[in-house]
């Protein structure tokens, strides 16, 4: 039967739709797995994507490990077997320059709220030739040319897929956010994030009770770093650094249950940096992490 291929790195939003489609179409959902650093090997790409593959959907950057996936190799292999290649760019678009033509992906999606825009707005890029073949998935006002009592003809792209009243304020805000990010420039964004990540990883690595997930190379963490403190639940860690240091850590499974299970971690702490963060922010974070165990009576 037909197969859909994703990776173990995926956010639930790039797992659940494919589980649903696999059940509806009686297809098989397959996973590409990663090594200890979160890297998908070329062997895994060549083995999992086969002539049975119809869809390959892959994250650009893991929202847990921060690792970038080998998109070009995956997309090339998908096209070799006649499959559609879809990229989840939610964690990639804010942190790295992306050229969808250069990638040659068939679809690319990202959300606004990871790149300085409000929640409830995002972007879906699709190749025109594919979008023209697709029927509208949602029907309503503004996506038609004509309507009769029994039938309708649909508007051309992109209106065909934009039924109902759009999130106008969200779209205006997303445009402003994208323009601002482009003004700052991705070369600066990447340099600043690397500087901050280098300090964070070097300092955390000095602490014997810290486990860092993903690559030991700070350059391979695109804006996010997941870690755990021995014997202390991430929810306690995040609450303590918030209360004592006004630091916002994400604690939990990061909407990536399969990956956390694969990493043998129930949950993790995740710190994320962006270009507006400073070295002082990182050192303040490190100082709070050093105090967490003493807050709970360890090492006293």
Language-model region placement:
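Pyridoxal 5′-phosphate
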Residues: 1-300
């Amino acid at each position: 039967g037909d197969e859909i291929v994703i990776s173990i790195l995926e956010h639930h939003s790039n797992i659940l739709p494919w589980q649903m489609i696999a059940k509806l179409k009686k297809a098989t959902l397959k996973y590409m797995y990663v090594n200890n650093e979160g890297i998908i090997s070329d062997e895994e790409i060549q083995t999992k994507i086969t002539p049975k593959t119809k869809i390959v959907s892959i994250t650009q950057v893991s929202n847990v490990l921060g690792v970038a996936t080998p998109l070009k190799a995956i997309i090339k292999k998908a096209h070799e077997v006649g499959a559609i290649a879809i990229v989840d760019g939610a964690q990639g678009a804010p942190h790295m320059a992306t050229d969808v033509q250069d990638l040659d992906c068939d679809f690319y999606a990202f959300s606004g709220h990871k790149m300085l825009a409000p929640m409830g707005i995002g972007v879906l890029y699709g190749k025109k030739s594919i979008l023209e073949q697709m029927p509208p998935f949602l029907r309503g006002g503004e996506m038609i040319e004509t309507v009769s009592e029994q039938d309708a003809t649909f508007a051309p792209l992109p209106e065909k897929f934009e039924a109902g009243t759009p999130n106008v304020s969200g779209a205006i805000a997303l445009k402003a956010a994208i323009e601002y990010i482009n003004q700052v420039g991705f070369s600066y964004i990447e340099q600043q994030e690397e500087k901050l990540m280098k300090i964070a990883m070097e300092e955390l690595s000095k602490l014997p009770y810290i486990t860092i997930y993903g690559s030991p190379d700070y350059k391979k963490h695109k804006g996010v770093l997941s870690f755990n403190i021995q014997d202390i639940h991430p929810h306690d860690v995040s609450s303590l650094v918030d209360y004592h240091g006004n630091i916002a850590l994400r604690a939990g499974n990061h909407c990536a249950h399969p990956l956390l299970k694969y990493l043998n971690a129930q949950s993790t702490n995740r710190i994320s940096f962006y270009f507006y963060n400073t070295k002082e922010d990182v050192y303040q974070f490190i100082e709070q992490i050093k105090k967490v165990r003493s807050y709970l009576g360890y090492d006293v």
